[in-house]
Design a protein with these regions (language model features):
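Conserved, mostly hydrophobic/aromatic
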Residues: 52, 59, 70, 129, ...
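Alpha-helix-loop-beta-strand connector modules within alpha/beta enzyme cores
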Residues: 78-105, 172, 176-178, 230-238, ...
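Catalytic alpha/beta core domains of metabolic enzymes, predominantly
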Residues: 130-269, 280
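N-terminal small/glycine-rich loop or linker at the start of catalytic domains
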Residues: 18-44, 145-149
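Glycine-rich, proline-tolerant flexible connector loops at the mouths of alpha/beta enzymes
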Residues: 40, 65-88, 214-215, 272-276
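Active-site beta->alpha loop and helix N-cap motifs at the rims of alpha/beta catalytic domains
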Residues: 81-163
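C-terminal helical cap(s) of enzyme catalytic domains, especially alpha/beta-barrels
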Residues: 141-150, 276-299
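Active-site mouth loops of central-metabolism enzymes
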Residues: 32-54, 106-114, 158-163, 184-186, ...
Length: 320
């Protein structure tokens, strides 16, 4: 087990590491696209593979060690796809420009996708992939997608549920284990710890357990300092946690993760604004900002090699 792993529940361990500037280097994951909103929300959001690869490269140069990928449907860039060929193409193009960045694919997919469609991306050979721990409900208004954007549509109210059963979660965890894919368990509220502990008891996930605390989305925990601290107190031993704050909560939740020795996810999937009323110019803008703030707070930034060690991934990047 890496020396970077420590018990985040122990305030004395945190104090000792903070006083000696020995918190683990910060893994910065960038979620470049997402599976819900698109260029109608921010014209700078990458949808096509070429756009995704270009922005990933800029984020990699800025210091991101992991990229979280949603592939879009080339017949309708406004929607997601589970086609493993689409994911494989993106993976291969990114690997050519970013030789050691960690490739993290979504199995959460996009609204309206059944389980069978969402898991097809595993055929694209990711190094790690998201593993949702329960159903998600959506209720949000998507802006009208107007020409000259491709695939225009009217404003729509998204009122949907991404259903996930215990059996499906177990099946997906087993698939990942059999293929050597490290699951990133997406925890939206405290009840999901029941599922995590069930997976641990079945030996379907391996140490260190990568757990992403998602706060601020509908039906997830409210994005407050108190809720985040409570979630950290319930982490299993030998865990690595990252924090994904949604919308305006992205920056404050990321700052707390930096302080507490966790890791961060930023990017346009979760927040298309740099501040109120000001759209992000690129995903790299979000990466550059969080790295600047982390360094000001004496957190080193993890290289892809260090991130692989922290997460228990192979030191040899995947090839395509």
């Amino acid at each position: 087990m890496s020396n970077y792993i420590f018990d985040h529940r122990d305030p004395y361990e945190w104090s000792k590491r903070t006083a000696s500037s020995s918190l683990p280097p910060l893994i910065v994951c960038v979620a470049i696209t997402g599976g819900v909103h698109g260029k109608e929300a921010n014209p700078n959001l990458p949808e096509t593979p070429v756009e995704q690869v270009a922005q990933t490269f800029d984020c990699y140069r800025a210091g991101a060690s992991m990229v979280h990928i949603h592939a879009r449907d080339p017949k309708n860039w406004a929607t997601g796809t589970g086609d493993p060929g689409a994911f494989y193409e993106i993976n291969a193009m990114i690997r050519e420009k970013c030789p050691d960045i960690i490739l993290n694919l979504t199995t959460g997919g996009s609204y309206g996708q059944p389980f069978e469609e969402r898991i097809r991306c595993l055929d694209a050979k990711p190094e790690t992939a998201s593993l949702n721990l329960g159903p998600e409900m959506y209720k949000s208004r998507l802006k009208a997608r107007k020409a000259p954007l491709p695939n225009p549509r009217e404003e729509m109210l998204l009122n949907d549920c991404s259903c996930t059963t215990y059996e499906e979660i177990t099946t997906l965890a087993k698939m990942m284990k059999d293929r050597g894919i490290r699951p990133e368990m997406e925890l939206f509220h405290p009840g999901h710890y029941w599922v995590i502990n069930d997976l641990i008891s079945q030996a379907l996930v391996e140490k260190p357990y990568k757990i992403q605390l998602v706060l601020g989305s509908i039906t997830a925990s409210y994005a407050t300092p108190w809720n985040l601290m409570s979630l950290i107190q319930e982490l299993p031993a030998n865990s690595v946690f990252s924090v994904a704050g949604m919308g305006p909560f992205q920056l404050p939740m990321a700052m707390m993760a930096i302080i507490l020795g966790g890791h961060v996810r930023v990017g346009m999937e979760d927040n298309v604004y740099s501040k109120k009323g000001e759209l992000l110019q690129s995903n790299a803008t979000a990466v550059e900002r969080i790295i600047r703030l982390a360094r000001d707070m004496n957190r080193d930034i993890a290289t892809p090699s260090q991130a692989r060690e922290i997460l228990g991934l192979s030191s040899t990047p995947s090839s395509y």
